[in-house]
Design a protein with these regions (language model features):
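Alpha-helical interface subdomain recognition
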Residues: 1-142
Length: 142
C-alpha cells in the first residue's frame, strides 16, 4: 500500500524553493542590458513551472484528504508522488537552465535543488513503481 507522506509536501518545497531562488536571481542577473527576468521567455518558463508546482501540490492535498476521510487513496498517493517528484525534478532542471553556468556552482542553491529533486524520483518507490500502482488501480493485471 502506498501512503501519503510528508515527503510529498517536501517535494513542493524543493520545487517552490527553486522557483523562488530563480526569480530572485533573474531579477538581478543582467544580460543584453536588462535583467533576464524582463525577457518574456524567462517569465513564461517560470509561470509554467509555478502552474505545474501548484497542480502537484493540489494533487498531494487531494490524496491527503482522501486518506483523512478514510477513502481508498493508494492510487491518489501514487499519483501525487509521481507527479510531485517528476515536477520537482523538471522544475529544478529548468531553473538550472535559466541561471546558466551558475546553476552548477555550489555557490548558488540551484545544483542542490536539482540533486534534492532527482532523488525523490527514486526513494519511497521509484516513478516506475508509482506507475505500476496507478496501472493496477486502472485494472492492469500482473
Amino acid at each position: 500500500m502506498v501512503a501519503v507522506s510528508v515527503s510529498q509536501l517536501r517535494l513542493y518545497g524543493i520545487a517552490q524553493g527553486a522557483i523562488n531562488e530563480t526569480v530572485a536571481y533573474t531579477k538581478e542577473r543582467v544580460q543584453f542590458g536588462k535583467p533576464i527576468w524582463k525577457f518574456q521567455n524567462t517569465q513564461f518558463q517560470l509561470a509554467d513551472m509555478q502552474a505545474k508546482v501548484d497542480a502537484a501540490r493540489l494533487l498531494v492535498y487531494r490524496a491527503a484528504q482522501a486518506k483523512q476521510d478514510g477513502e481508498p487513496h493508494s492510487h491518489l498517493a501514487a499519483m501525487a508522488k509521481l507527479v510531485a517528484s517528476e515536477t520537482a525534478s523538471d522544475v529544478a532542471r529548468r531553473c538550472v537552465q535559466l541561471v546558466g553556468g551558475n546553476g552548477y556552482s555550489r555557490e548558488y542553491p540551484f545544483e542542490r535543488h536539482m540533486r534534492d529533486a532527482k532523488i525523490t524520483e527514486i526513494y519511497e518507490g521509484t516513478s516506475e513503481v508509482q506507475r505500476m500502482v496507478i496501472a493496477g488501480w486502472l485494472g492492469a493485471t500482473k
